[in-house]
Structures are given as C-alpha cells and as structure tokens.
Amino acid sequence: IIYPGTLWCGHGNVSSSPDELGRFKHTDSCCRSHDMCPDVMSAGESKHGLTNTASHTRLSCDCDDKFYDCLKNSSDTISSYFVGEMYFNILDTKCYKLEHPVTGCGKRTEGRCLNYTVDKSKPKVYQWFDLRKY
C-alpha cells in the first residue's frame, strides 16, 4: 500500500525511476530518502549481533531520526502528518544503534521509552530503541 499522492511512502515504491516523486513532493522525498537508508535489517535478518523478529524491515536510528525530522519540516503538512502517524505511531517499530548498554528508562510515555539510561563504563553495543511518537 502506497500513501495517495506519493510514490515512495508505504511498502516498497511505485516510481519508475529514483528521481520520480508524487504530487506531495516533500513528503515523497522524505520517504524516498528513508527507503534508501544504507543500514537496514529485513524481517528475520541478523546483523550487528541483533535479530529482527518483526514482520517488517527495521532501520538504523539515524535513518529513522532523519525521516522524522524530514516529515516534521515538510511543507506537505497533511500528507507528512499521516505518513508520520502511520510509521511512528501505528506501526510502532523500533530502530537500532550503537550505544553504551542500556540500564533503564528515565522517562516513559505511552509504553515507549523516551530517555534511556546507559552504563558509560562499558563499551558500546548495538541495541534496539523505541521510536519517538510523531
């Protein structure tokens, strides 16, 4: 399913070339960049010492953070809002990054950790992290 007015926002894309964008160009550009993230983990794949047990692809936190910021700064406010809601709030996925071992959660809202506490005395390892709510 691709969000109406876009070619890149949804499962896969329906563009005829990497340069083609839909009617909502700003939103679609955010989705295209997100789709081209160089660090992804497909469903069932293991990488960086982690295994993606979700039924969908998960991305590095760097790519998801850039996607979030891109959508928030898009001039296509309505389409960006709906795409952000779907990805960050409804899909309720996680991202991964290299960070000192998590020891707890300093602040939690709606079942998601917003502020992790880490043990800086130990070396960084790849771990799963909750995404921000949109």
From Swiss-Prot:
Positions of Ca(2+) binding: W8, G10, G12, D35
Single Gene Ontology MF annotation: metal ion binding
Cystines in this chain: C9-C31, C30-C70, C37-C63, C61-C95, C105-C113
Localisation per UniProt entry: Secreted
Top-level lineage group: Eukaryota
GO biological process, one term: arachidonate secretion
EC number annotated for this UniProt entry: 3.1.1.4
Cofactor note: Binds 1 Ca(2+) ion.
Active site: H34, D64
Sorted UniProt keywords: Allergen, Calcium, Disulfide bond, Glycoprotein, Hydrolase, Lipid degradation, Lipid metabolism, Metal-binding, Secreted
Cofactor names: Ca(2+)
One cellular component (GO) term of this entry: extracellular region
InterPro entries named in the record: PLipase_A2_dom, PLipase_A2_dom_sf, PLipase_A2_His_AS
Catalytic activity: a 1,2-diacyl-sn-glycero-3-phosphocholine + H2O = a 1-acyl-sn-glycero-3-phosphocholine + a fatty acid + H(+)
Glycosylation site positions: N13
Organ and tissue specificity: Expressed by the venom gland.
Family classification: Belongs to the phospholipase A2 family. Group III subfamily.
Entry function: PLA2 catalyzes the calcium-dependent hydrolysis of the 2-acyl groups in 3-sn-phosphoglycerides.
Protein name: Phospholipase A2
